[in-house]
Amino acid sequence: MTESIDLNRSESESDNNTDDVTPIFAIDDSSKGRVSGPTRRSTKGGWTAEEDQILTNVVKKYQGRNWKRIAECLPGSEENRRNDVQCQHRWLKVLDPSLQKGAWKKEEDELLSELVKDYMENDRPPWSKISKELPGRIGKQCRERWHNHLNPTIIKSPWTREEELILVQAQRGNGNKWAEIAKLLPGRTENNIKNHWNCSVKKRLEQFPSNLFSGVVYGSKPSSGFEYNFFNQRNTMVESCITSQIKEAAKSPQRDFLDLTLGLNWRSISSSTSSLRGEESVSSSVDSVCARLNACLETPQNSNNDTVCVKEVREMKERLRMAARTFDTPSIISKTSSPASGLKRLRQKYDTPFPTDARSHMSSEEDHSVSASPSSKYRFVKRNTCSGSKPLERRLDFDFLLWDEHGRRNGIVNFSVRILPQKSDLKSGLVRPFWLR
């Protein structure tokens, strides 16, 4: 019944309009008795292979002139099928066999530059006219090639810090409206701005708090710590957080030395294994002797670089405090050989045993020294305590980074601490705490 109604309707329409063309593939064979075509009729969806084939056949029949009649030949109802503009764009930008989609040649670039100069009208070249002079190229291709590559006003140098700050602030206010953002960045194209945001700035910005650039105003100078961390991809989130903590600490008066508690006073702890494993006894011993385990890190007195020194010293304070809080003393100092992991056994195997001669157990500055890199400006005074029934074959290593007043990394301080017993303790059978300088 449906098939007969569709046939009668098509016959009546052909009688009224003799010039109309019956839609191709509108009626399937009688054995199936249904309208063929894709199941999805939304004009917002992608083109199907069947629609492309029908459009190609109809364009050849009408020689690409009457696009309204060409659109009527596509399958679907009047509300769901493609309109004339969609058909024209699909043919000219995708299906036209004479369309060139490859890379631009040098001759094409030179010709396009000359045509733009000839057809320039109020800084808006007529791209439809220019495309007719370039076989195989459409107006959109010519416009994008000129604005993104050939325009002499384009800035192709690396992005500066000021440009990136403007981009961050503009994106917060305008979103992904690259045309509006391009007005604030002369010489940067919309495509360049979009690519730089998605590939570089956005990824780096995700590592920082959301309110980091909320107070940035065009032309203002940002804070040096966050500025350096943002523009240096090698820095980590921990470094940026430490820098922010140092800046907050700089607002309040601080002492010129560092109070550092490195661990436990093992002399006051029972020698039994249970006392080492008990968390309550360990914490109580720490509270009772923490006042005697302080080391001082003096700040160098230099009036010229006072601000830089304060920043560097306070940053080192934070790092040393973090190391003290996470210092796992029982895993390093132990009276009995506990079952160690493979990594610990490997390190114990290749660690050089400490010499047992009299000279090696002298607590002099030559034997107990902290080495620093040549670029560091400060020396550290550090002390630790230990106890045990035999010489300890362990080494403590700490690395600290230094920055200059411009926020650049200018050195690394390395602490390598070797814990040795004193000569007098070996004779008496006791290992007493000593100061490590």
UniProtKB/Swiss-Prot annotation:
Any one GO molecular-function label of the UniProt entry: sequence-specific DNA binding
GO cellular component terms, semicolon-separated: nucleus
Alphabetical keyword list: DNA-binding, Nucleus, Repeat, Transcription, Transcription regulation
Disulfide bonds: none
Quaternary structure (record): Component of a DREAM-like complex which modulates a variety of developmentally regulated genes and of the mitotic genes in proliferating and differentiated cells.
Protein's name according to its UniProt entry: Transcription factor MYB3R-2
Biological process annotations from GO: regulation of circadian rhythm
Key word DNA-binding present: yes
Knockout-associated phenotype: Aberrant circadian rhythms.
Chief localization: nucleus
SMART domains given in the database record: SANT
DNA-binding region coordinates: 67-95, 127-150, 178-201
Subcellular location: Nucleus
Biased composition (Basic and acidic residues): 1-12, 358-369
InterPro entries: Homeodomain-like_sf, Myb_dom, MYB_TF, SANT/Myb
